[in-house]
């Protein structure tokens, strides 16, 4: 029993180490792919979320957008080329191609998503109650905040309806629909963008939480809706 227990402990440590390595590898892929969207959509105003090029691998530090240099908890990122930090390696691209095929070929997943997007909504009114997910972007004085989407301003109900339209365009529109590429990118912004009604924070501090020990950098400042 003692020997079996020791083997289990060793196997658990090995498994945890492998999970950690996989987590780090897929996180780096995430940062690289997010950079592609950020570069493609300057109107998202998310340049501060591109951080890989700020790493000094020799010093094992990173200079953050606030101008300060911080020591990395882990600087071993073998898939990041300092000369071109956001370029996927061949192996990373192969992983993403396989993941993409798995998602688009899953009929059960398509069925669930199709149901959500066909019948779901960014908001609804039930028993005279307004129901919505997360927040409504507000100004400091509590008034509805104007949010820019593709060069036009939206707020309140109009914002939620525009977001709902973009979500459906991303999923239901044909590949050659000229509005689809922006809609697809906006679905990502909806998840982590500062003016997204589904997020409404100044940033998603994924990199900071994984690689920096300073707690103040982990903080995600919520919008005025939460004040």
Regions found by a protein language model. Name each.
Residues 1-9:
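Single conserved hydrophobic/aromatic residue that forms the stacking wall/gate
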Residues 215-221:
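Short glycine/proline- and acidic residue-enriched helix-loop micro-motifs
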Residues 221-227:
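C-terminal, well-structured subdomains that either form a transmembrane helix-short loop-helix hairpin
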